[in-house]
Structure formats: C-alpha cells, structure tokens
Design a protein with these regions (language model features):
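A short coil-to-beta-strand element that immediately follows conserved catalytic motifs
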Residues: 78-86
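Residue-level preference for beta-strand/loop junctions
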Residues: 22, 80, 98-100
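Acidic, metal-coordinating catalytic segment for phosphate/diphosphate chemistry
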Residues: 1-27
Length: 146
C-alpha cells in the first residue's frame, strides 16, 4: 500500500537492522518581548519539573501541524510564525525506544492561558528558573531555544 508516496509494506520489513521504535514529539517556546517565556511545571512522573509545552505527533500528522494543535491543547494558546530551532533525542526503556523532539519557538500567540492536569502553565524569566525543579535536559533544550 502506498500512502503519501511511501510504500507502507516496505517500512520496517528488513528486521536485520534491529531498528528501535521512534516516538516523534514537538516542543515550543512561546516568548514575549520582555524576555519571559512559557513553561509548564509538569506533575506527571514520566517527565516532572519545568519543561516547554508540547507533545506527540499523531500518525499521518505533519510536524508543523502538531505544534499548534499541541500548544492549543496544553496551553490554550493559538501559535503561529513558528521558527524551527533544531531537535533533541534520547533513549527510554534501556535502548528500546528513541524519542526525537523537534523544537520550535515563536512570539506570535493569542488566547488565554490554561493549565491542565499535566501541570501549571506560566510565563517565567531566565533568572527565575533556579526556583523550580527542572525536567530532564531542560537546560539543554532552553539553550537551543534561546
């Protein structure tokens, strides 16, 4: 079956490479002219502490479409004019699962902030970061997004 120019029967047919499962996610830094930026103080045990809002890219969804969807779901904000800022990757469950997070930033947003069961959403300045517990790789991600 060919879908979007990709033969789905061909993908992962060659098991000699022992490829890991890759989970594709997005993260976005929303920032203001005063230097503050949006963070989430996550409560979930799988990724606790300060992080940037984001989430998983759905099957058949374009990465660039996942960012506004996830930002609306997690923060209540509508974002636009996204600037790609690179990526980070890490392994989970030993080496069985690879995570690849595409990073974006923007100062174009509208709407009202809303927190969720995953954690509190708020704007913060760089000098306030040390007051909070940080998620894994937060400082590395922050440096890429600055």
């Amino acid at each position: 079956m060919i879908q979007n120019g990709i033969n789905k029967d061909f993908i992962n047919k060659d098991k000699s490479h022992n490829q890991k499962i890759t989970k594709l996610t997005v993260m976005c830094m929303v920032y203001k002219e005063d230097g503050s930026f949006l963070v989430e103080n996550r409560l979930k045990k799988d990724w606790p502490g300060l992080t940037f809002p984001g989430g998983h890219v759905e099957d058949e969804e374009l990465i660039i479409d996942a960012v506004p969807r996830e930002m609306k779901e997690e923060t209540g904000l509508e974002v636009s004019n996204l600037e790609p800022r690179g990526y980070i990757e890490w392994n989970e469950f030993g080496d069985d699962v690879r995570h690849l997070a595409m990073l974006f930033k923007t100062k174009s947003f509208k709407g009202n902030l809303k927190s969720s069961k995953e954690g509190e959403i708020f704007f913060i300045k760089e000098e306030e970061i040390k007051k909070y517990p940080l998620s894994n790789d937060f400082l590395e991600i922050y440096k890429k997004l600055k």
